[in-house]
Amino acid sequence: RGPKNWCKVHPCWTTCGSQMRQSPININTNQTIYKRYPRLKVENVHKRVIATIRNNGHAPYFEVHEKFDDEIVLRNVPERPRRKEYNFAQLHVQLGRDEKEGSEHSIDNKFKPMEAQMVFYDKDYEDVLEAKSKKNGLVVISVMIEVYGRSKEHDDCACDGETCTVRYVRKLSKLMEKYYEKVRRYPLVSINPHFLTFIKLPRKCWYNKCGRTPSPDFIEKKCEKEEPETRPFFVFEGITPLDVIPYDTNRFYTYAGSLTSPPCYETVQWVVFKCPIKVSSKAFRMLQLVQDSHLDPLEKLGVRRPLQTNKNVIVYRNHLK
């Protein structure tokens, strides 16, 4: 049915039909509001944490396996209380059907081939699964990705009249090349029977709830454990946000949005870095070849959600134009 009809597919996904703060969006820089924020701070960012990689049928993603002394913790999140801390949990890389327009967000209607999304969750919760439905439970740091050798631009690209030095992220390239090959096939292990029960229900039961978020009680009992289980592969090298972040981490845009895949909960503070990074063409190709839940390569349809139109989303920037 496609992203436009996600809210009609499953009763846990009704938030996908909201028009309040759904993601992704086009960031119109002329309409952003300047606001000073303290610098983002990441504790233990130089540590490589234990991780696995899975293919959930939508896209492959790296998942952190935490130990108490190895948590990578994000602080000074814009528009969130200063005391709040968020644990690094996942790394996703999105791409589209069009090789040049694979990022989910756009800046002044310009896309990049891919977009890296680092997911952090509020430490008040046990894990990302519990936090993602909770108010202000998640923070996602987004970095646009170019492909080495495919861009006509030089390493220095003009961004809003200023220059970004584009970092070639060698370690991320190697991780993508190696581990996207391992999860190329879609390896479904099991599926929660609750999910199949909902699919068999007459859809009119929840059609009229499109745009409304399910109750906390419903989410806890019916939604939090319904995702299919898939085979994990151990990432021997581990991961760190340093694999992904651009040279310039001082300039970003931020807004209150949502998850970009079902259940689309509106619980995310997005931080979109102004400057991109660059990965190898082989890394890009390995991602394109990963299978989705229909056993088609991701390059056929892509995994990016279309831009969303919201009623009142304010985008802030922490830098002068």
From Swiss-Prot:
GO annotation (BP), single: one-carbon metabolic process
Record keywords, A-Z: Secreted
Any GO CC annotation of this UniProt entry: extracellular region
Coiled coil location: none
UniProt name for this protein: Nacrein-like protein
Gene3D superfamilies cross-referenced by the UniProt entry: Alpha carbonic anhydrase (3.10.200.10)
Active site: H58 (proton acceptor)
Domain of life: Eukaryota
Species per Swiss-Prot/TrEMBL record: Mytilus californianus (California mussel)
UniProt similarity note: Belongs to the alpha-carbonic anhydrase family.
Molecular function terms, GO-annotated: carbonate dehydratase activity; zinc ion binding
Locations listed in the record: Secreted
Domain Alpha-carbonic anhydrase: 1-319
Tissue note: Component of the organic matrix of calcified shell layers like nacre and prisms.
Pfam families in alphabetical order: Carb_anhydrase
